[in-house]
Amino acid sequence: MHAALITVTIDPGKEDEARAMLDAQVVPMVRQAAGFVAAYWLEPHDGKALSIAVFDSEENAKAGAPPAGMRPPGSPVFVESVEFHNVMANA
């Protein structure tokens, strides 16, 4: 399994809008991605939020994660960085 560790910045005062977008668009889209295993979105802190999305292969992780530097049109979220890691263990 491979994980995508994603760091995003949320525009100040737009946390509720970002959460609504996450629930309505991002979560359903990620669930349908090829090789999807699990994903976790962590609550924002100081305008930054992290997510971890786990896929069955590195290829699917790279295909299912957003590119760094992306801001969807009209979105209050900017994708700062995306890292890919092999999952060593889970519980």
Map each language-model feature to its residues:
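Short S/T/G/P-rich N-terminal loop/turn motif that feeds into the first structured element of a domain
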Residues: 1-50, 56-68, 76-91
